[in-house]
Amino acid sequence: MKAKLIEIHIFPKFEAAFKAYPQLPIKRLRYLCELIIQTAKETQGVDKLDLGLKWGEPAFRSNIGSTLRIDWKSKNPEQYALYFQCSSRLIETFRLLYEPKLRFEGNRAIIFKLDQEIPIYELKECIKACLRYHEIKHLEFLGIK
């Protein structure tokens, strides 16, 4: 799908959260931000995207989806992650479709090494599913083909 205009609301604390990260993780997290926004613009049914904080982490929420968070943690400084609602079917489905291309942590995250090349196609499919979750949660494999 071609990119479309969507309403994006950025809460002030969203940008401030990035000041707490070291330089290399900031670059990776900013890249994920851009990828999430671009994917939202390409995703059917997504007309609005809020960028804020949830549990102190940069978070994204569409008008029809589940919350998606990104973070880097000092206890695992060589990695960063994309976090999903743990009570959803998202990670369980992604694991069936995309393991071992993507690395998972429990039922809540996709983990990346700071020096890893990201599998863009698979990651965008995961982001789309999260952004549309409330419309697709009843579908087999969340409608991912």
Walk through the language-model features, giving the residues of each.
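Charge-dense, helix-prone N-terminal extensions
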Residues: 1-145
